[in-house]
Amino acid sequence: LGIEKSLVAKLAYAYHLTLGPGTLGLGVDIGMLSKSFENNFIAIDDPTLDPSIPNSGTSAATFDFGAGAYYYIPNKMYVGISTLHIPQTSVEDVADQGGVGALDFQQSRHYYIMAGYDWDINNDKKWILKPSVLAKTDAASTQLDVNALIEYNMKVWGGVTYRVEDAIGLIVGANVGEFISFPGLKLGVAYDLTTSTLADHSSGSFEIMLRYCTNIYKQPKREVYRSVRFL
């Protein structure tokens, strides 16, 4: 924030293969992380007393990679596990600073586990209940999200989400493309209300999601060659 700037660039690749009734996806990503600090930091006290703040403008970069696996059965269930910052590299630049007030940003490995299930309430594929969970940890602290959405006719949905000891939220959305003849367009809104001690200083947060998905690969048309010899 302020004098600090971050730049992350990654390339990701996933391979899908059929496994039983579903599909298993295996993926990796590799990239770089860059951190920089400007030299126009203004502090009311002496900033050189804080070894975590660079004494002058500096920047540095390092590589990073992650991996994950995801198994899903369409319109039925999914489960996934992944980890980020596997090498736990650090972004550091101690040149010409004597190691005091130098840039030293350590990345921590993060783990994610998620799972979800689609329950056809009336067995008519109209009302679908979608409970799901997401657990995140860096081996020092853990965060758990519990969600429940209900979807009608694959067009509109709504539900609640609860982040343990942190927040509770409401979610609504619609597959707006179905209403305006623009397939693949979805719109969603969410409001999170803080339940932790931060509630005294926060009235919650409001989010808007706009998503468009389309298939960029089109199945080639089958061409038939006819010859008078075989008519």
Feature-to-residue mapping (PLM):
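Subset of outer-membrane beta-barrel
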Residues: L1-L231
